């Protein structure tokens, strides 16, 4: 079974079994809702166990969660640094033109018939995501995910068609 990272437990919160989670999901309210089941992975990315969310609230930049049947700091302190993941079968269906990062990373990028490179990372600097494209013999290319640049995303064929606008490629 495939799992996808949704957050990391960075610390405990108080004495009643709450944990601070640095979330990396766009669906925190759903992922951390009471009764949701998540997979717990250790620092070596090994599956530890399935956990059920007992409570969730936001505090500043963190999601504060508590696991069912784990209501004391001594029970949960060992989970600091562990990752929370969701099973692939539990991923939400997305609207047209929306993609999960794991679907985009690894796709080949083409301008016309010319291979530009492969998407290796996605950045979130502001209003739009920026795709980092690894190229042979050149520096990485930063492509904003906006309609004039990204023309077509073909997940089944692992291909993205783009138009590299003037000023985006400083090596040309």
UniProtKB/Swiss-Prot annotation:
One of its GO terms (molecular function) is ribosome binding. GO terms for biological process: ribosomal small subunit biogenesis; rRNA processing. The gene is rimM. Belongs to the RimM family. Keywords: Chaperone, Cytoplasm, Ribosome biogenesis, rRNA processing. Binds ribosomal protein uS19. One of its GO terms (cellular component) is cytoplasm. This is Ribosome maturation factor RimM. PANTHER family: RIBOSOME MATURATION FACTOR RIMM (PTHR33692:SF1). Residues 95-168 form the PRC barrel domain. It is found in: Cytoplasm. The keyword rRNA processing applies. Gene3D superfamilies: PRC-barrel domain, RimM.
């Amino acid at each position: 079974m495939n799992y996808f990272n949704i957050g990391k437990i960075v610390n405990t919160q108080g004495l009643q079994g709450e944990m601070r989670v640095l979330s990396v999901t766009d669906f925190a309210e759903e992922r951390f809702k009471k009764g949701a089941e998540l997979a717990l992975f250790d620092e070596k990315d090994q599956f530890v166990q399935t956990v059920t969310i007992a409570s969730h609230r936001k505090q500043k930049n963190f999601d504060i969660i508590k696991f069912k049947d784990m209501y004391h700091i001594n029970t949960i302190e060992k989970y600091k640094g562990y990752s929370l993941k969701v099973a692939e079968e539990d991923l939400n269906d997305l609207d047209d033109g929306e993609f999960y990062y794991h679907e985009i990373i690894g796709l080949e990028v083409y301008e016309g018939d010319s291979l530009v490179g492969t998407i290796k990372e996605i950045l979130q600097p502001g209003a739009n995501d920026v795709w980092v494209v690894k190229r042979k013999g050149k520096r990485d290319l930063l492509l904003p995910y906006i309609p004039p640049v990204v023309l077509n995303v073909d997940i089944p064929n692992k291909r993205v068609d783009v138009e590299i606008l003037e000023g985006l490629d400083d090596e040309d």
